Design a protein with these regions (language model features):
Chain B
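Hydrophobic cores of alpha-helical transmembrane segments in multi-pass integral membrane proteins
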Residues: 3-116, 136-155, 168-181, 191-216, ...
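Membrane-interfacial segments
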Residues: 155-165, 219-224, 284
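Interhelical loops and loop-helix junctions of multi-pass membrane transporters/channels
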Residues: 116-129
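Short hydrophobic "helix-edge" motifs at membrane interfaces and signal-peptide entry regions
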Residues: 54-55, 121-123, 218-219
Length: 467, 287
């Protein structure tokens, strides 16, 4: 019944190691295959160690989120970690690349990840979508269950609270966003503007995508190898985005400059692609209309002197980076408040999870009381329907207060012995319940108790919604 | 209204404008609507004062220095409200309303003296004089707007050029902060476009106004050749705006240089108006 998270991220492993893990669980098929192997891990008594599983994989992290079987103890968690480490790496000491969190720490970690507190760029919004994908996939592979359902929903809820109640996401920090925002300071509307993208870098792609999102319809892409540019467009952009893009010969980009309003440069060239003397005549041809140049390549591809030309505005990656730095500071300040929210939610989750420990005891106790009542009342009441009604009513009345106390005891660690005392007092044995012939839909009762404990009766409908 | 003098009436919209800025300075989003409502209320009251006074006194009532200043404030406000509606640029309203308020205050302190034009102008010339004043004031209001827009342009262009104090993302979400701290809506293209619109509309009005002024001067002094300081400054102003318009249309001049031209042109207008109305009325050519 323990929550276990084993994984590696940008904080624990370098990009090379992360790539090795990521490649082996890159596709859903690969992930399903590995998940099956994990779920088949058994203890010495040939009992499965893992009840529920979800695999989260992003460019910066790979994590395995598990709900362990009740009989799995600390030793088994290390066994699972060794197995995961051995699956991905042949080298010795690779288990040091992986971190491991159990129960409260695991919940706190997942909530922090979902709230983007553990991300490379704090507050970035993509991570929550990636966690939702991981959860959906777990549902699809039927690897989820009551505990992971609750854990993930609590993570989504926590992430939402963090985003709305703190300023962690109020100041965007991506280069592409900054480029678009800067453009809006120069141009009134981006819809009628022409953008020239020089090079086919990742950053250029993201920025071009962001410009399209902001209404740009004309983007020209020029690369030294035209085929590479065509392939880049084919691979990187959706159908609608492709309608806004034209690939041109690299030799022709200069002819396009007088008609271009924004130039995005991300080539791998070692020298300047655009020089001061190139831009001077262009500005005259443009009749002094403003020209915005964004140089996101390292080393720089646009001559910095160009910024001195009237109506030309040049920003390189450092200039944009400085603007983003301020926002990162804001986010780091907000992270403290966000961590408190994460901790509160993790505590709430653990309370709910601990309350589950009481459910089997409650079920057994109810059954015991019902059995006694049934035997005694059968002597006086013949009609089954009437008898069952009375039995249920009396059981509820007798056990209302004890059940409340049992639930409290399950949550409160200082009263951990109460459950054991109760079992001894009433001779409740988890293993013998079914053997004694009780066929009273115990699962239904367990589910009802769990729902009461979680206070979340819409859990199942929420799962369907996310699916 | 009849219990109040014209000067006291000017103080009603003046205090409304001043009061409205208190709501803006509270920096609470819910108060921004109160600010806007008060500004528009002030404008409506200004308009009511204008039309009621016009109804009571007729056009001859306009021939007092304080009334001309009040009229100027009203025209500026019309231009600002129209620009605000067309361009959705809230900063225009925020920046120009104080100028309107100052104009109203000047109107209160300006001499409430009627200029007796009946004795010096024929009926036809009186109409020409009135049109001259209205055209010049509308043109000047547009140039005043262009002046403010140009100042904002130069300030914002500098921030973008030197890459300092340029807040991109600080979402405080209140118009006061958006305008003064983030420069939201201050895109250079829109500022330049508004500047050009002011010039395109204002220049013909000023041209006709100056032509009428020259005609009136001829009518009054019986000669085109009497050169007065106001005429020199007016012609110099006209020349600056003519060059600016020509450069914009023919050579596509825009941006910082165009903004500087607008600023210089307006400073000349201010000097000519100050000289002619407040400091040396004889500067205009009449006492």
């Amino acid at each position: 019944m323990d929550i276990l998270i084993i994984g590696l991220s940008h904080k624990s492993a370098d990009i090379g190691d992360r790539e090795i893990v990521s490649k082996k669980i890159l596709t859903p098929e690969l992930r399903q295959e590995f998940a099956k192997k994990l779920l088949n891990l058994k203890d010495e008594g040939d009992r499965p160690l893992i009840k529920e599983l979800a695999i989260l994989t992003t460019c910066n992290r790979s994590e395995f989120i598990m709900d362990l079987s009740p009989w799995a103890v600390g030793k088994e968690a290390h066994f699972i970690k060794d197995y995961i480490s051995g699956y991905f790496f042949a080298k010795k000491g690779a288990d040091n690349l992986f971190y491991m969190y159990l129960n409260f720490e695991a919940a706190k970690h997942l909530f922090s990840v979902a709230s983007s507190l553990d991300s490379m760029v704090i507050g970035e919004p993509q991570i929550l979508g990636q966690i939702k994908d991981a959860y959906n996939e777990s549902c699809e592979f039927r690897m989820n269950g009551q505990v992971l359902n609750k854990l993930f929903h609590k993570a989504f809820y926590c992430a939402k609270r963090v985003r709305t109640e703190t300023k962690i996401a109020s100041s965007p920090v991506s280069i592409s966003y900054a480029a678009v925002e800067l453009s809006k300071k120069i141009f009134n509307s981006l819809g009628d503007k022409k953008i020239l993208l020089l090079g086919t870098g990742e950053m250029g792609k993201l920025t071009a995508k962001h410009f399209i999102k902001n209404g740009v319809h004309n983007i020209y892409i020029a690369n030294r190898t035209k085929e590479k540019a065509c392939h880049f467009v084919e691979e990187s952009f959706g159908v609608n985005e492709k309608n806004c893009i034209d690939v041109i010969d690299f030799s022709e980009y200069y002819k396009l400059l007088p008609h271009t309003d924004i130039v995005l440069c991300s080539t791998g060239s070692e020298g300047y692609v655009l020089r001061y003397d190139d831009i001077m005549p262009v500005i005259k041809l443009r009749k002094q209309r403003p020209l915005f140049l964004i140089d996101i390549s390292v080393p720089r591809n646009i001559d910095p002197e160009i910024n001195k030309i009237s109506n030309v505005y040049l920003y390189d990656i450092d200039d944009i980076g400085k603007m983003i730095e301020g926002n990162l500071e804001i986010r780091k300040k907000e992270a403290g408040t966000a961590s408190e929210l994460v901790e509160i939610n993790a505590k709430e989750f653990m309370e709910w999870k601990n309350s589950l420990n009481a459910v089997p005891v409650i079920v057994l106790l109810r059954n015991k009381v019902k059995d006694i009542l049934e035997i005694e009342l059968s002597k006086y009441i013949g009609e089954k329907k009437e008898k069952d009604l009375i039995i249920n009513s009396l059981t509820n009345k007798i056990l209302h207060e004890p059940i409340t106390l049992i639930k409290k005891a399950a949550v409160d660690s200082s009263e951990a012995n109460m459950l054991e005392t109760l079992k001894t007092l009433f001779n409740l044995d988890l293993g013998t319940d079914k053997e004694n012939g009780h066929k009273r839909n115990n699962d239904n009762i367990i589910n009802k108790e769990c729902e009461k404990g979680s206070g979340d009766k819409n859990n199942l409908s929420k799962i369907k919604l996310i699916k | 209204m009849i219990f109040m003098t014209a000067g006291e009436l000017y103080l009603i919209p003046f205090f409304i404008y001043v009061f409205s800025y208190m709501f803006l300075l509270l920096r609470k989003k819910r108060f921004y609507q109160v600010f806007i409502s008060l500004i528009y209320s002030g404008f409506i009251i200004q308009s009511l004062i204008f039309f009621i006074w016009l109804n009571l006194r007729g056009f001859k009532g306009m021939m007092s220095v304080d009334w001309i200043v009040f009229f100027n404030a009203w025209i500026i406000m019309i231009v600002v409200v129209l620009f605000n509606l067309f361009y959705k640029a809230k900063y225009i309203l925020i920046y120009i309303t104080p100028i309107v308020a100052i104009n109203l205050l000047l109107g209160f302190f300006a001499p409430h003296v009627y200029i007796n034009i009946k004795s010096i102008f024929s009926n036809f010339d009186q109409a020409i004089l009135l049109t001259h004043i209205i055209l010049i004031l509308i043109g000047d209001s547009l140039f005043a707007l262009a002046f403010i827009i140009s100042l904002i342009y130069i300030f914002q262009e500098r921030r973008i050029k030197i890459k300092k104090n340029l807040k991109l993302f600080d979402k405080k979400n209140h118009p006061f902060d958006e305008v003064f701290y983030q420069g939201k809506g201050y895109n250079l293209e829109l500022l330049d476009s508004m500047n050009y619109q002011c010039l395109k509309i204002g220049f013909p009005l000023i041209t006709i106004g100056i032509a009428m002024g020259i005609y009136l001067s001829n009518s009054l002094f019986k000669s085109f050749m009497i050169v007065k300081p106001i005429e020199i400054i007016s012609l110099a102003t006209w020349l600056i705006y003519a060059v600016l318009l020509h450069e914009r249309v023919a050579k596509g001049l825009r941006g910082k240089k165009a903004a500087v031209f607008s600023i210089v042109g307006f400073l000349l207008i201010i000097s000519s108006l100050s000289f002619s109305f407040y400091l040396f009325p004889e500067f205009h050519g009449f006492k």
